[in-house]
Amino acid sequence: MFTHKAAALPQKKRALRGRRLVVVDIENVVGGAVLTTEQAVGAHLAIEVVAALDGSEHVVVGTSHIGAVSSGLGWRGPRLVVRSGENGADLALLDVLIEERVEERFDEVVLVSGDGIFAEAIAALGTAGVNVTVVAPAGRCSRRLRLAAHRTITFDPLLVSFGGAA
């Protein structure tokens, strides 16, 4: 007689009490490398309004080495992930979304970017039961990304230039 050990089924997602992860492609928000602290401050203020940040969320900002210092000084507090090269900031943020068990740790993910490179990871999070919102500058959000998210919010890129003033 043969007995087979049943594979352990994944445990039900524990009650996360509304934990929220906000992942920011700051270069997508400002339209290129963050060269000044003022650009980072403007991005922070605009995102704070559009994504309704209240200080309780875990924020991760992705940038290339070119904007690392300006981003870090202009938006203090968030975790900063840095990678050089083509799509460096995007790839650094993808590592967070894919490799850090986000679906087990957070109920909601807000991605601040319009880049289609995130579509597959966002779709996977949604399939895993995470509520996903994409926040992107108007006219700069890929169709694939919009379709992958539960909700999409766009904002006027000029908000960044004027530090979030409406």
What are these regions (language model features)?
Residues M1-A92, N131:
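Domain-level signal for Mg2+-assisted phosphodiester chemistry and nucleotide/NA-binding surfaces
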Residues H65-A166:
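Nuclease catalytic cores that cleave nucleic-acid phosphodiester bonds
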